Amino acid sequence: MNPRGLFQDFNPSKFLIYTCLLLFSVLLPLRLDGIIQWSYWAVFAPIWLWKLLVVAGASVGAGVWARNPRYRTEGEACVEFKAMLIAVGIHLLLLMFEVLVCDRVERGTHFWLLVFMPLFFVSPVSVAACVWGFRHDRSLELEILCSVNILQFIFIALKLDRIIHWPWLVVFVPLWILMSFLCLVVLYYIVWSLLFLRSLDVVAEQRRTHVTMAISWITIVVPLLTFEVLLVHRLDGHNTFSYVSIFVPLWLSLLTLMATTFRRKGGNHWWFGIRRDFCQFLLEIFPFLREYGNISYDLHHEDSEDAEETSVPEAPKIAPIFGKKARVVITQSPGKYVPPPPKLNIDMPD
């Protein structure tokens, strides 16, 4: 295990998002099942923490950008700063939606269409952000997720306001289409990993990478699809499972996503104005971490040494025997040498 390589590819932004979503997905089913009686404002505490860190990081980054004009010429600093501003705008719209959801659940005074209005604005903004991101080679997971789900947001709002009376299985048709695409992605990675495993021209590192990607996608998509199916059947009244048991597959998907952040390069360097990789930033603040970060562990080293020590010594080579009459070379098998039988003399009577 190499901690240095592990943390150099660490993506702190996605790790923060998945951690907050995991905590929220734990608190929400506990509240829905009545195990805890907290206010929904408290249940949404991980979401508030997520948005607070986003706003604080963008504010500090904007301050560093304004006070240090010389930083604007460093590599792709301008592109990363614009990407940070776009992400903050999307997060602020999501924050408005979450505040309206909590207010609607606690007081119940306005329509759900009004609650979902920020999401209706998020989708076109996300489409524009995706176009800009593809041109500048930026990571766009959140933007793509918001842009493709506009129809799903409309259906859910209409269903909650009882304008349409479809079953939840039909309401989530846009989600089923999206999950079908994700299942095709999983199938694609499985096929390619099998092809790489059977190919002899591929190095072991590439095989390992494709197999890891296939396992990761399976562990993310299959539990997520299971969670959605169980939730839809629970909302339609086809089962009486507790919400805690329904959310268990979602926890597995989020834990897998958290694990993938340690091998996922990326992240904007302008959050909190650090202007460098998160690993380098931590090593500068905490120098004692360098001692641990420069250590690598080889768990198979001792086993290989023991195997070399206990290896069977090579059998001594035995010189070939030349047959004079047949003029052939008889090679004896090493380790299986059998001495010739003694010469037998038979005395014949006169």
Curated annotation (Swiss-Prot):
Transmembrane among keywords: yes
Membrane topology: Multi-pass membrane protein
Secretion signal span: none
GO CC, any one term: membrane
Primary localization: membrane
Pfam families noted in UniProt: Tmemb_185A
Membrane-traversing stretches: 16-36, 41-61, 81-101, 111-131, 168-188, 211-231, 240-260
Keywords from the named record: Membrane, Transmembrane, Transmembrane helix
Keyword presence, Membrane: yes
Compartments where found: Membrane
Matches recorded under PANTHER family: FAM11A, B PROTEIN (PTHR13568), TRANSMEMBRANE PROTEIN 185B (PTHR13568:SF5)
Membership in a protein family: Belongs to the TMEM185 family.
Protein name: Transmembrane protein 185B
Gene expressing this chain: TMEM185B
